[in-house]
Amino acid sequence: MFFKKANKIDNRIDTLVGADTRIEGDLHFSGGLRVDGAIHGDVSEQNSNPSTLILSEHGRIEGAVSAAKIVINGKVIGAVKSSHFIELQSKARITGDLYYKSLEMHTGAVIEGKLVYLGDNAPEDAA
C-alpha cells in the first residue's frame, strides 16, 4: 500500500461534469472523468480499458461507482468499487461499502460503510 509510482493517477480528463451540471441517470465513461457537479445514477467504466474517475470537493454522486482508478474528495452515496486503486482525499464522504485492491485514505476522509478488500483473486462481480 506504499507504492506511489504504481498507483499514479492519470491526469488526462476526457469528460467533465461541470459544477452547475446535474445528470439524472447512469453514466458510462472511458478514459478520464472529472465530476464537479451532481450525478443521480450509477457511474461506471464503459469498457475493459482502465479508466479514472475524479470526484472534486464539490462533486456529488448518488449511485454505485465503479472504475479502475478513483480519486474522491466529494460525496458519494452508494457502493464504490475500484479494480485497481482508490484515493480518498480529506473532504471525501462515502455512505456505502467500499471495494478496493489498494486504498489511500487522507486524514479527514469519512466512510460510513464496510471496507471490503478484493485482493488479487477476488471475483469481478464482488460488488
Residue ranges and their predicted role:
Residues 1-62, 71, 77, 84-127:
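Intrinsically disordered, low-complexity terminal regions
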